[in-house]
């Protein structure tokens, strides 16, 4: 096993740990989930570049008769990238005392101001940071509003 294979295993393990945390652990942290809303994805250009570069590496490894283990590890890395960037849906998860946004826990008392932009983006102003929440379904903004009023 080469150093390249070890690095690939490390990256695959990191992506797998992130996927498991995002899918199974985070919804169970900090109490029961009150509301979980699907968000719009960010630009997919970065993901296409990543998966494309890994596909080029797979092609290069196969045509130069590289190690079969490296080809399998690159394929697993491409599949993990495809899952994280294309299949997994980003979500905002509301709990009793706060919410998870982009895998970060934010308590409700940190919200200083909330606005709704003309294009349906909920803007939450924290102490030193501004969150731009783009929901997939515009009707979910009303659910978020009702939940935040209920918890304030």
From Swiss-Prot:
Which NCBIfam families does the protein's record reference?
PRK02913.1 (NF002791)
Q: List where the protein spans the membrane.
A: 6-26, 45-65, 67-87
Record's GO cellular component terms:
plasma membrane
Its encoding gene is what?
Answer: yobD
The protein, known as: UPF0266 membrane protein YobD
- Keyword set for this entry? Cell inner membrane, Cell membrane, Membrane, Transmembrane, Transmembrane helix
Enumerate the InterPro entries for this protein. DUF986 (IPR009328)
* Recorded superkingdom: Bacteria
Q: Where is this gene product found?
A: Cell inner membrane
Note the topology in the membrane: Multi-pass membrane protein
UniProt lists the family membership as follows: Belongs to the UPF0266 family.
